Amino acid sequence: MSTMTPREIVSELDAYIIGQSEAKRAVAIALRNRWRRMQLPEELRQEVTPKNILMIGPTGVGKTEIARRLAKLANAPFVKVEATKFTEVGYVGKEVDTIIRDLTDMAVKQIRKIEVEKNRMKAQDAAEERILDILLPRAKNKWGETEYEKDSATRQVFRKKLREGALDDSEIEVDISSQMNVEIMTPPGMEEMTSQLQSLFEGLSPSHSKKRRMKVKDAMKVLIDDEAAKLVNNEDLKQKAIESVEQNGIVFIDEIDKICKQSDRGGADVSREGVQRDLLPIIEGSTVNTKHGMVKTDHILFICSGAFQVARPSDLLPELQGRLPIRVELKSLTKEDFERILTEPSASLTLQYKELMKTEGVTVEFTPDGISKIAEAAFHVNEKTENIGARRLHTVLERLMDGISFDASERSGESVVIDEKYVSEVLNDVVDNEDLSRFIL
């Protein structure tokens, strides 16, 4: 779990996302509260429930990007899902329970990685012994049993060479344990049955080893992973993963506005109101059956987001609104925001294009007036057509860089300055013609 303070979390998000300080503060506080809760006495800890968040804002202002960056900062089980992928129980499509199953699978992977790292030193020693056994087979007694006597002088010499890398390029044949992978194809909506059948068949198939010929340095890596996996207790791992999900799990549900029931629509809304009803018990707190065990969702943090351009937050079921007490509104981006997006983030769009062209030997330089003109063009097209936020910058920049990207391999050693004049020459015809900008930008 992340031990970062809210200020540190916001500072980390600022490196990638421009503006939206209110949304950053809300997720930073929610993430820090996960840590605060774990410091409380057991009895009080059970009473403190997470305050779920609803992020409201037009497309392209940073809702999904906040989720992506939060996943890296959280250091906890985190899953991002699209609300539109789910349907009501009984219909063809994914059921909402799969959210918790995916979250548990994610936690198992995380914990397994941690456990493998913990056992890496022991695994390294075991892998070293296995390689030495191949290079210098141990003597056998008269009954054919291997004798594990104290290391001989020759074995010590080979051990020293192995550690110094003198044997790295020697080829050896190693036994790698492997288990049969079973792939089962089922229709959508039957994920639970799939995982149960998969577990059953994997349990029935015996693990066996296969011989592979490789260099000593490659064999060492493979054998370390093999030995580390053997040292991990799967039952303890599952228990830790379930506990991690229950206490620290975070679920980000995007496009929640798309499952609002619209009053002007008739007929059955299979993927709308029914999905909301199915989400209620999971967000409120229930027990979900997964292949790793039963998972309680009482203390999982849910962050929902939506553009709410057609629907309104009040169109959500009242019970669901009550389970999302913290509302955060993300603001539309201005021309100044676009300028900052082009230059300030640690992996800004202009930097990406510069580095891409540098691989071909072409030096690209963006001047301040050129960046201002690009931002103005993107903002202007957003105003005249559909407002898709910062995503418009990708489209405008691709159009702007089209000629340079195409000819880059033949222009090695050249320098290109992208200033206001250059941007105007390339983009003005498209930006000023509303019909063209609607289809091209």
UniProtKB/Swiss-Prot annotation:
Gene Ontology MF terms in the entry: ATP binding; ATP hydrolysis activity; peptidase activity; proteasome-activating activity
Keyword field: ATP-binding, Chaperone, Cytoplasm, Nucleotide-binding, Stress response
Alphabetical list of SMART domains matching this protein: AAA (SM00382), ClpB_D2-small (SM01086)
Short name of one Pfam family: AAA
Subcellular location: Cytoplasm
GO biological process, one term: protein unfolding
Database matches in InterPro entries: AAA+_ATPase, ATP-dep_Clp_protease_ClpX, ATPase_AAA_core, Clp_ATPase_C, HslU, P-loop_NTPase
Residues given in the record as ATP binding sites: I18, G60, V61, G62, K63, T64, E65, D254, E319, R391
Gene Ontology cellular component terms for the protein in this record: HslUV protease complex
Transmembrane segments: none
Main localization of the protein described in the UniProt heading: cytoplasm
Functional description taken from the UniProt entry: ATPase subunit of a proteasome-like degradation complex; this subunit has chaperone activity. The binding of ATP and its subsequent hydrolysis by HslU are essential for unfolding of protein substrates subsequently hydrolyzed by HslV. HslU recognizes the N-terminal part of its protein substrates and unfolds these before they are guided to HslV for hydrolysis.
Subunit structure: A double ring-shaped homohexamer of HslV is capped on each side by a ring-shaped HslU homohexamer. The assembly of the HslU/HslV complex is dependent on binding of ATP.
Annotated family: Belongs to the ClpX chaperone family. HslU subfamily.
HAMAP family reported in the protein's UniProt record: HslU
Protein name in UniProt: ATP-dependent protease ATPase subunit HslU
UniProt source species: Actinobacillus succinogenes (strain ATCC 55618 / DSM 22257 / CCUG 43843 / 130Z)
Organism classification: Bacteria, Pseudomonadati, Pseudomonadota, Gammaproteobacteria, Pasteurellales
Gene assigned in the entry: hslU
